[in-house]
Amino acid sequence: MTTREYDYIICGAGSAGNVLATRLTEDPNVTVLLLEAGGPDYRFDFRTQMPAALAYPLQGRRYNWAYETDPEPHMDNRRMECGRGKGLGGSSLINGMCYIRGNALDYDNWSTHQGLERWTYLDCLPYFRKAETRDVGPNDYHGGDGPVSVTTSKPGANPLFEAMVEAGVQAGYPRTDDLNGYQQEGFGPMDRTVTPKGRRASTARGYLDQAKTRPNLEIVTHALADRILFDGKRASGVAYLRGSERATAHARREVLVCSGAIASPQLLQRSGVGPGAWLKELDIPIVLDLPGVGQNLQDHLEMYIQYECKEPVSLYPALKWWNQPKIGLEWMLNGTGLGASNHFEAGGFIRTRDDDPWPNIQYHFLPVAINYNGSNAIEMHGFQAHVGSMRSPSRGRVKLRSRDPNDHPSILFNYMAEALDWREFRDAIRATREIMRQPALDRYRGRELNPGADCRSDKELDTFVRARAETAFHPSCSCKMGYDDMAVVDDEGRVHGLDGLRVVDASIMPIITTGNLNAPTIMIAEKIADRIRGREPLARANVAYYVANGAPARNVAKAVRQPETA
C-alpha cells in the first residue's frame, strides 16, 4: 500500500473537480491530487469528441457508469436509465453539450434560504462569465476569455430549427435571442459547449489542458475512491483502489468530493457520513449521523413529441451507415459539417400557467426522430421536441447497497409522485401540440408519431408519460446546501459537523435549476474555488434580468392559430 501527501485531494475529475484542480493549482505553493475512476479523455475517440456522436458514450460502460434506478413506482415500475460520465471530464465528457445556465430566479430563490444570501443570480453571474469564452465575444452576460468554449447558432443551420422557434412565437410565446442573457423565457437559439474546431468542450479540454502539466497537480486515472479517512471529525485523506492495488493519500488541508449527485452521497455514506440507520444496516462505523446525505434527489424528466417531416430536410439520412464515413471525415479534417454539431441548436422555456413565476417547461428541438441514447430511431424523415418539467416537487434518494465501492447504490428518483407533476406534463404535451400546428411548420409537419393524435384525454396522456418519459440526465441536490436539518453542506460546500471536507458538484444544489446542469455545476465550482483559496468573491454583477411579475404566460390573442377546442 502506498501513501502520499497533498494539500488537497479531489475525488472526481468531472464538471466541478476539474475546475477546482485547475484553480487551486494556479498557486504554485499548493499541491493537488485529482482522482478519477475512469480513464483519460482520448482525443482521437470520436465517441466523446465528435458532438454529433453524443449518443455513443451512453451505449456502453467505458465512459458511462450506466446506473439504473430501482423500479420507479409511478412509472409502471420501470428501472430507468441514469447515465453518469466516467473519465476525465466526467459527465461533461458524455453530455448533450447544451450550455444552459438556468433562470435568474433559480438563484434568487436559493438565496432566500437561510444562510444562502450570497447565491443570488447577480452573485453567480460573474462566475458564469469567468468560466466562458463565447464565440461571438463577451458582453454583460457572457465571458470572452474563460476555459469553456461556447458556440452559438450560425446561419445555414437546419431550417427546422428556425421553423420551430417561429412556431413557438406564432403560438403566442416570446422570442429570445439569448437563453442565457437578459431573458431565458421564450424560444430561440441554444448555446453549446463546442470548440471553434468542432470538438466537444468538456472540462477536461477546457480546464485540465491548461493545468495538467503543472508540477503541483497529480492526476491519477482508474482510481476509484473507496473511503474518506478521518482523524476524529477531520477528513485526513482518501483510500482508493487502482485495479487490485490499494492506496491511500493524505490531505494536509481538505478533501474535496466532486463525484456527482449519485457517487458523492455514495462515497460519504461508505465513509461513515450519512443517515445513521442506513449506515448501521451495513455495519459501517458512524463518523457523523448526517440525515440529509443521499436525500432530496432531483432530476428532470422529459418526453419526445415526434412528427413525420414532409420535406427531406431532417437528419434521418445521417443515421445511415453509408453516409457516416463522409460526415466523419469532414469533421476529422475540418471540424465542420454535421459531425461538428450536437444538433440541439434551438429550444426554449415557457410558463404553462400565468401564476408560474418563471418557466416550468423546457424544450430542446431536434431535427430527427430518435431517442437521446440513439435507440428507437424512426425510419423516416422526422423531427421532435424534447419536453419536460423543470422543478418537480417529487424527491428521491441515493442509498448505499454495500460497502464495496464497485457496487452501484440504490437509486430512486420517485418520478411523478406528486399531482403537480402530472398537471405539468399534460400541459406540456398540449402546449407542444399548439406550437407544432402553427403555420411556420406547415410545410414540414406530417402526422404526429408519438404520442399520436388519438392520445388526447388526461388518462391517455398520463399512460403515455408513465410508459415513455425518460431522464434528461440531470441528477442533483442529494447533498444539499443550506442550514436546515436536512442540509449536508454550508454555503461554501463545507460538510456540516466535520472539518477539512467539502462537497462541490451538482449534488449541493438545494433545488434543481431550470435547464441543463453542466454550466451551473461549473459555476458552483468556480465560486467555491475562490472561497477555498481565501479570496474575496467577484464583485456582484449589475445587470437587468427578466421577471414576469404576473405577465401572461402566453399571448393567446396574438397566436396565428388559436387553441383547438376540446
Swiss-Prot record:
Residues 185-204 are annotated as: Disordered. GO terms for biological process: glycine betaine biosynthetic process from choline. Its EC number is 1.1.99.1, 1.2.1.8. It catalyses: choline + A = betaine aldehyde + AH2; betaine aldehyde + NAD(+) + H2O = glycine betaine + NADH + 2 H(+). One of its GO terms (molecular function) is flavin adenine dinucleotide binding. InterPro entries: BetA, FAD/NAD-bd_sf, GMC_OxRdtase, GMC_OxRdtase_N, GMC_OxRtase_C. Keywords: FAD, Flavoprotein, NAD, Oxidoreductase. Pathway: Amine and polyamine biosynthesis; betaine biosynthesis via choline pathway; betaine aldehyde from choline (cytochrome c reductase route): step 1/1. Its cofactor is FAD. One of its GO terms (cellular component) is membrane. FAD binds at residues 7-36. The active site is at 474 (proton acceptor). Transmembrane segments: none annotated. Belongs to the GMC oxidoreductase family. Involved in the biosynthesis of the osmoprotectant glycine betaine. Catalyzes the oxidation of choline to betaine aldehyde and betaine aldehyde to glycine betaine at the same rate. This is Oxygen-dependent choline dehydrogenase. The lineage of its organism: Bacteria, Pseudomonadati, Pseudomonadota, Betaproteobacteria, Burkholderiales. The gene is betA.
